[in-house]
Swiss-Prot record:
Its EC number is 7.1.1.-. GO terms for cellular component: plasma membrane. GO terms for molecular function: NADH dehydrogenase activity; oxidoreductase activity, acting on NAD(P)H, quinone or similar compound as acceptor; quinone binding. Belongs to the complex I subunit 1 family. This is NADH-quinone oxidoreductase subunit H 1. It comes from Rhodopseudomonas palustris (strain BisB5). One of its GO terms (biological process) is aerobic respiration. It is a multi-pass membrane protein. NDH-1 shuttles electrons from NADH, via FMN and iron-sulfur (Fe-S) centers, to quinones in the respiratory chain. The immediate electron acceptor for the enzyme in this species is believed to be ubiquinone. Couples the redox reaction to proton translocation (for every two electrons transferred, four hydrogen ions are translocated across the cytoplasmic membrane), and thus conserves the redox energy in a proton gradient. This subunit may bind ubiquinone. It comes from the Bacteria. The chain crosses the membrane at residues 1-21, 74-94, 107-127, 147-167, 179-199, 238-258, 262-282, 293-313.
Length: 319
């Protein structure tokens, strides 16, 4: 009973920390976008606008949340929760330090891929439930994008898994004590980051919510906290993909002088800032170009990287 209470307390604490980090990340993103676009960004609430995300949260909580006419109310309400919950669950197996995780799962990588994949179902569910043509088109785009990018997302990280010989997050990090896997797997790391951007539905792969032609895509009919949960799920997905990239390719918590969790946080922050930089600088491609890149370029490269890694691993074990 005491162990259950301790686990529940740690879980709630982790969720609260993640919510604060996600909110702070929205402020960092807006400030960086303002810098790139030569404007100020948030600068009114708190020092340098650092409390703007709290004001936005209060605003969202006080807005009316009403399903549109003709919507499937149960699915409409369920979809935002499905968008945020799997991502929060994914952080439960992330190794923030040596043995510092909520749940030490031997197949942590597989679990995380499954959790990231569930976010696409939330998009499709919300799009279908909204009873809107714009939302439905966004949901169809999300389904096609998920089929394309989830495939090579899994294939791109298999190189690191093969080098470590395990699906355990801890074992993968420990295998990088001599050299980070980004050195041994540069192509795999690049492909994983590209697929991660698509999995999080971030620019330039945010076609399911493209404002130019779909108003707000699958979120067109959402308001209030329902919209906020979709928004939260997206930013948490960015942080989760960044944390997974750090674990797989950038040595996890390993580093000199500083404690492991600090190294992990710094590395994750750098990857997340790269996501923001991509949003600020890259244009949104056409949808056919998005899918063509996935099936015709990224997937063959992922298979080639996997084959080459397999040959190297077999040759190393034979020698």
């Amino acid at each position: 009973m005491i162990g259950l209470i301790i686990t529940a307390t740690i879980s709630v604490t982790l969720i609260m920390v993640l919510l604060v980090v996600a909110g702070t990340f929205t402020w960092v993103e807006r400030r960086l976008l303002g810098f790139v676009q030569e404007r100020l960004g948030p600068n009114r609430v708190g020092p340098f606008g650092s409390l703007q995300w709290i004001a936005d949260t209060v605003k969202i909580l006080t807005k009316e949340d009403r399903p549109p006419p003709g919507a499937d109310k149960f699915a409409y309400i369920l979809a935002p929760a499905v968008a945020a919950t799997p991502v929060l669950a994914g952080f439960g197996v992330i190794e923030f330090g040596d043995g510092l995780s909520l749940a030490a799962v031997d197949v942590g990588v597989l679990f995380l891929i499954g959790m990231l994949g569930l976010t696409a179902y939330a998009v499709v569910l919300g799009a279908w439930a909204s009873h809107s043509r714009f939302a439905l088109m966004g949901g169809m785009r999300a389904a096609a994008q998920m089929l394309a990018y989830e495939v090579f997302l899994g294939l791109s990280l298999m190189g690191a898994v093969m080098l470590a010989g395990s699906l355990s997050m801890n074992a993968i990090v420990e295998a990088q004590r001599d050299v980070w896997f980004v050195v041994l797997q540069p192509l795999g790391a690049a492909l994983f980051c590209i697929a991660g951007v698509a999995a999080a539905h971030r620019l330039p792969f945010d076609l399911p919510e493209s404002e130019n032609d779909l108003v707000a895509g699958f979120m067109t009919e959402y308001t209030g906290m329902s919209f906020g949960l979709f928004f939260l799920g997206e930013y948490l997905a960015v942080l989760l993909v960044s944390a997974l990239a750090v674990t797989l390719f950038f040595g996890g918590w390993l580093g000199p002088w500083l404690p492991g969790p600090i190294w992990f946080g710094l590395k994750t922050g750098v990857i997340a800032v790269v996501f923001v930089w991509l949003r600020a600088t890259l244009p949104r491609p056409r949808y056919d170009q998005l899918l063509s890149f996935a099936w015709k370029i990224a997937l063959p490269l992922s298979l080639a990287n996997l084959l080459l890694t397999g040959i190297v691993v077999v040759a190393r074990s034979a020698s």
